[in-house]
């Protein structure tokens, strides 16, 4: 770590640790990325998701309030749109039909952030991320899982008929959006979508990974999973107008970039993702 970086490892539900992390520091802003993530595991361990994503966010907001930190960025999720059938998803669309514990906790996090923003004048931006991918991404996500399994000549799980679609967003574009949000001086509380603004079906994604690896996938066909949205698609017009956000890396470019990184990472003997 450099002289301007101090790393504190711990649990955001630990109020004492948060007090220590904020003690004597006049932070310009807090970017809250800490969370338990993933729709499917949230069905198996909803208690852990409620603890981290709701109680943890509450405790962090308390620490921000006590420290007088003027600005907060909260990483939310496209999953809050739930059963919304209108495409693309707009920040003005209904968000009262979440279909997973994970989505419910992210929506609760947004509401907590709104409350603290208005009560304590913490300028807050909630960013709804759409399926972020790229180097060092979570190993349970489709792109990293498919890359590893196809590369190792193992079957990949394919849920449903392959028509489900996601708006995949390369991590570099997400970072650009976060940096822009840190400089945003709009309302005391606001919400933006950050996505790639294009949809890719599961079948198309598998084909992209196959092409990047130069290998065909062996398919383990499985039924659709409850809680998974059939399609996500970000309307990023608001972020474009007010943040200058413009996703630059389409999925056809991003998947090969990720696969190349993965192969180089494995060649260094790193093992896993």
Name what the model sees in each region.
Residues 150, 178-182, 206-209, 236, ...:
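Hydrophobic "lid"/C-terminal helical patch
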């Amino acid at each position: 770590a450099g002289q301007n970086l101090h790393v504190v490892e711990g649990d955001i539900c630990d109020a004492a640790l948060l007090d220590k992390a904020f003690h004597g520091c006049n932070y310009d802003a807090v970017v809250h990325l800490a969370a338990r993530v993933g729709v499917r595991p949230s069905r198996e361990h909803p208690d852990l998701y409620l603890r981290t994503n709701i109680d943890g966010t509450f405790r962090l907001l308390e620490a921000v309030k006590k420290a007088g930190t003027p600005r907060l960025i909260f990483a939310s999720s496209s999953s809050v749109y739930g059963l919304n059938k209108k495409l693309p998803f707009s920040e003005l669309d209904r968000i009262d039909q979440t279909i997973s514990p994970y989505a419910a906790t992210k929506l609760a996090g947004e509401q907590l952030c709104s409350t603290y923003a208005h009560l304590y004048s913490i300028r807050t931006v909630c960013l709804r991320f759409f399926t972020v991918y790229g180097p060092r991404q979570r190993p349970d996500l489709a792109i990293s899982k498919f890359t590893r399994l196809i590369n190792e000549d193992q079957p990949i799980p394919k849920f449903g008929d392959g028509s489900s679609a996601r708006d995949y967003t390369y991590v570099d574009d997400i970072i650009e959006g976060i940096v822009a949000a840190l400089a945003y001086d709009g309302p005391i509380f606001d919400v933006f979508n950050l996505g790639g603004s294009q949809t890719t079906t599961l079948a198309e994604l598998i084909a992209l990974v196959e092409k990047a690896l130069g290998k065909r996938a062996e398919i383990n066909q499985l039924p659709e999973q409850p809680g998974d949205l059939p399609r996500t698609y970000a309307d990023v017009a608001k972020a474009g107008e007010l943040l200058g956000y413009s996703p630059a890396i389409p999925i056809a470019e991003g998947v090969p970039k990720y696969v190349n990184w993965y192969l180089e990472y494995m060649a260094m003997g790193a093992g896993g993702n």
